[in-house]
Amino acid sequence: DCADSDCTGNPACPVGGTAIGGSCELKTSAGTNVKGTYSASRVNYKAGIEFDAGPESMLYASVVTGFKSGGQSNADINPYLPEDVTAYTIGSKNRFFGRMVTLNAELFLMKYKNRQENFSALDRGGAQVSSLFNAGRAEAKGASVDLTIRPTGNDTFRAAVEYTEAKYNDFVYRNYRAGNPTASTACVVNPVVGGSAAVGFWTIDCSGFQLPRTPKWSGTVSYNHTFELANGSKIDFSPDMSFASSRWLSAEIVENARAKAYALFNASLTWRSADDAFSVQAFVRNIGN
């Protein structure tokens, strides 16, 4: 019985609203108040296991659940639902050669239900607003490796790399705008059933696209060498590099909001007093622009 809802978990459309495409559209004017109530609760858990494979090696696995509360969107009267995530990890932490080398590796899988995303849209009164909505199901899976080498007491080399496949499994949202949004997104665009291009109701299907702000490849490389001076003070020379592959910056999947791959180089030179009471640093960020 869906008498009190639209059969998707949203409340029934109130007086003044129009049911279009399984959602409730309400075109409001300035000063119009839309009131309602919302509540949600969850019980989360964390479970894990560790196994010492040797004096300097450990294997571990865990499963963790998380919850982000829902609420009321600015763009329409439909509440956005809570976001639930379940994260699975399995990994290993190791030290070799008298702790000269540290090597950690991890595999991970994160499953999202009703993932919350933020996007810019027009409200029913035609005003530009930032709105939260549910993107449906999504997952992120991948692997990370961290390596630290200390060949001497004055030298430290670190490297970390992560590979992530993160995508929307089910991501269909509705937007209210004037004109066909096909040119502004790489997603599949269709008029909403019951609406028309004239009133600007559209469904946008971004299923299968990469999650925003999640590059496939990312990592860092750094080195530190400490020069010990005759008066007991020290100088640290520390170059580093970070990189990331291309990624979308917003859930709208807009080409002009796609960040290109980059590599960022930095370096610093730090003088420290013999008692480490104070220091002076010179640094360069984004070498090579």
Model features per residue range: what roles?
Residues 1, 63-69, 96, 107-113, ...:
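Transmembrane beta-strands of outer-membrane beta-barrel pores
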Residues 1-111:
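Structural signature of Gram-negative outer-membrane beta-barrels, strongest in the C-terminal barrel
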Residues 1-38, 72-76, 114-133, 169-207, ...:
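Solvent-exposed loop segments that connect transmembrane elements
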Residues 43-49, 76, 86-90, 131, ...:
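Hydrophobic, lipid-facing positions within transmembrane beta-strands of outer-membrane proteins
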Residues 52-66, 82-172:
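Membrane-embedded beta-barrel scaffold of Gram-negative outer-membrane proteins
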Residues 86-89, 102, 209-289:
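Conserved C-terminal beta-signal and adjacent last beta-strands/turns
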Residues 109-111, 133-251:
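Gram-negative outer-membrane beta-barrel transporters
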